[in-house]
UniProtKB/Swiss-Prot annotation:
Protein name: NAD(P)H-quinone oxidoreductase subunit K
EC category: translocase
Main localization category: membrane
Function: NDH-1 shuttles electrons from an unknown electron donor, via FMN and iron-sulfur (Fe-S) centers, to quinones in the respiratory and/or the photosynthetic chain. The immediate electron acceptor for the enzyme in this species is believed to be plastoquinone. Couples the redox reaction to proton translocation, and thus conserves the redox energy in a proton gradient. Cyanobacterial NDH-1 also plays a role in inorganic carbon-concentration.
Note on cofactor: Binds 1 [4Fe-4S] cluster.
Gene name as annotated: ndhK
Entry's Gene Ontology cellular component terms: plasma membrane-derived thylakoid membrane; respiratory chain complex I
Localization in the cell: Cellular thylakoid membrane
Length: 250
């Protein structure tokens, strides 16, 4: 004997088994296993956590950067891995004076680095030429005349703590970038290429200013002054005959 279910029983069964379809929600269990992010954030996080610098040290500023490699400062915690090849580096740290003769080599290294790449100008000599540019015709007065610079680190020389501060600021810049907008915000000014022939200028400090009329008038009063007694030392005879006689007397 078969029993036919009532209409109310069928409706109750349908309501219990076939609930309304709603929007999926992220539960607490799912949020502990899945990280929701964007492609830009993931890409920037990977790049700022593994900066591979190419060390280009030409003067005393590089000694301060070499101090970071030791255990006292431990720059490995920032993910910095020094590379000896520009094709494996994404950060160029220029530390020291850049001369006209080394300028083509610096530009060649920059051109061989893959995109995206960054440059830190470390020290006063790198940024403005420093004290060497005052009386030198071969010192480049600012590395930004050769290649684009992302971050300037002044000092003579900068302390290792200042280098860490520069790396942290560069990491913030990398973290705020976007792949789609990088072309729009990229530096568009041209820099010197390798075959560029840099023009040499005549030296400025040649000593010719001493022969000017104003300098002659300023030096004339001191020309006739008597020499101090301490400077009037008797002349010493260094002939072989005098040396042999002094040896015989001793």
């Amino acid at each position: 004997m078969s029993v036919t279910p009532s209409i109310d029983a069928v409706r109750d069964l349908r309501a219990a088994s076939c609930g309304p379809v709603g929007a999926p929600s992220v539960t607490s269990d799912l949020s502990e296993n899945i990280i929701l992010t964007s492609l830009d954030d993931l890409h920037n996080w990977a790049r700022l956590s593994s900066l591979w610098p190419l060390l280009y040290g030409t003067a005393c500023c590089f000694i301060e950067f070499a101090a970071l490699i030791g255990s006292r400062f431990d720059f490995d915690r920032f993910g910095l891995v020094p590379r000896s090849s520009p094709r494996q580096a994404d950060l160029l740290i220029v530390a020291g004076t850049v001369t006209m003769k080394m300028a083509p080599a610096l530009v060649r290294l920059y051109e061989q680095m893959p995109e995206p790449k960054y440059v830190i100008a470390m020290g006063a000599c790198t940024i403005t030429g420093g004290m060497f540019s005052a009386d030198s015709t071969t010192a480049v007065r600012g590395v930004d005349k050769l290649i684009p610079v992302d971050l300037y680190l002044p000092g003579c020389p900068p302390r290792p703590e200042a280098i860490f501060d520069a790396v942290i600021k560069l990491r913030k810049k990398v973290g705020d970038e976007s792949v789609a907008e990088r072309i729009k915000i990229a530096q568009t000014h041209r820099y010197f290429t390798v075959p560029h022939h840099m023009k040499r200028v005549e030296p400025i400090v040649t000593g010719a200013y001493l022969s000017a009329d104003t300098q002659k008038a300023a030096l004339k009063p001191g020309a006739g002054l008597p020499m101090a007694a301490e400077l009037n030392t008797p002349e010493i005879d260094v002939s072989p005959a005098s040396q042999s006689s002094s040896t015989y007397e001793s």
